[in-house]
């Protein structure tokens, strides 16, 4: 029963790449590690670093950052 509930939740997952910012690397199979602004499930877009398939229909594990978190990271790199 728990598995079925999780499956329904996953079926409702959606994403929209709002802005492509940077390709960090590309592997031998064409997957790219990118920095983008991505909206997940209709929420406001966040900064997102993760791997993407060549056609951007599949994604790997990644990390999302709010505007504030992204600014903290940028400031840390400047110092």
Residue ranges and their predicted role:
Residues 2-79:
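Positively charged, low-complexity terminal tracts
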């Amino acid at each position: 029963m728990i598995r079925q509930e999780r499956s329904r939740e996953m079926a409702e997952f959606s994403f929209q790449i709002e802005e492509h910012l940077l390709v960090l690397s590309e592997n031998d199979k064409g997957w790219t590690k990118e920095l983008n602004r991505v909206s997940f499930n209709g929420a406001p877009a966040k900064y997102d670093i993760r791997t993407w398939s060549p056609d951007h229909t599949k994604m790997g594990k990644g990390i999302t950052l709010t505007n504030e978190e992204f600014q903290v990271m940028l400031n840390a790199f400047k110092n």
